Regions:
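Hydrophobic alpha-helical segments
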Residues: 1-207
Length: 207
């Protein structure tokens, strides 16, 4: 249930014009998401940190990667739900749709273990993502061996890269109560609310 929390962000997003040296990164994010995320607009107070995150994000989402870019967003979504980050759940849901995941597959993500829309390789990967995103980490040798049955070592590096990126982003956005953008809230309310998602503290600056 959406409790309409309207707490103030702990740090306010700054206008994108604040950091001219980051404009190329901002435009790349706008192309991928349809908007510039408030997380990076907060982070630009330290441009080197914002630039490093932008470069890491670009590498994780590399269009020349060997793991489907839409499915990578699903991995990030499952990892973010495991961590409890409503902000990143909305962003990854929108990203999944933007990069080719069908509505019905996104809607079935929390029944992935039984849904015919998810392959054995995808189910194994999402089990792994939950274990890797848990605190403490619960990945086992057997789990990793199962992952190896479906992916090359290069692909496994990409998968762990996604989970690790969201380990950072989940903590960043939950700690700073980053306000969700209108576009992300709309995605969350359409596709995630029926599974218990709410903007919660990330609704700040919207209501």
């Amino acid at each position: 249930m959406d409790q309409r929390t309207t707490s103030s962000p702990r740090l306010m997003p700054l206008p994108s014009e604040h950091s001219p040296e980051l404009q190329d990164h901002f435009e790349a994010m706008r192309k991928n998401l349809g908007f510039i995320p408030n997380s990076i607009l907060i982070m630009q107070r330290r441009p080197k940190l914002a630039r490093a995150l932008a470069q890491m994000t670009a590498a994780v989402w590399d269009p020349e990667g060997k793991v489907d870019r839409g499915f990578k967003r699903i991995i990030g979504h499952v990892a973010s739900r495991t961590a409890g980050c409503q902000y990143c759940m909305a962003h990854t849901a929108g990203g999944a749709l933007r990069f080719g995941i069908e509505d019905k597959k996104l809607a079935a993500v929390w029944e992935y273990q039984t849904s015919p829309l998810y392959s054995t390789a995808e189910r194994t990967t999402l089990d792994f993502a939950i274990a890797a995103a848990s605190v403490p980490n619960t990945v086992t040798d057997d789990m990793f061996a199962e992952l190896r049955k479906h992916w090359t070592e290069e692909q496994i590096v990409e998968i762990v890269g996604v989970i690790s990126l969201f380990g950072f982003l989940n903590r960043w956005n939950d700690t700073l109560t980053t306000p969700l953008e209108d576009e992300a809230i709309a995605i969350g309310e359409q596709f995630l609310a029926s599974h218990g998602w709410s903007p919660g503290k990330h609704r700040a600056l919207v209501d």
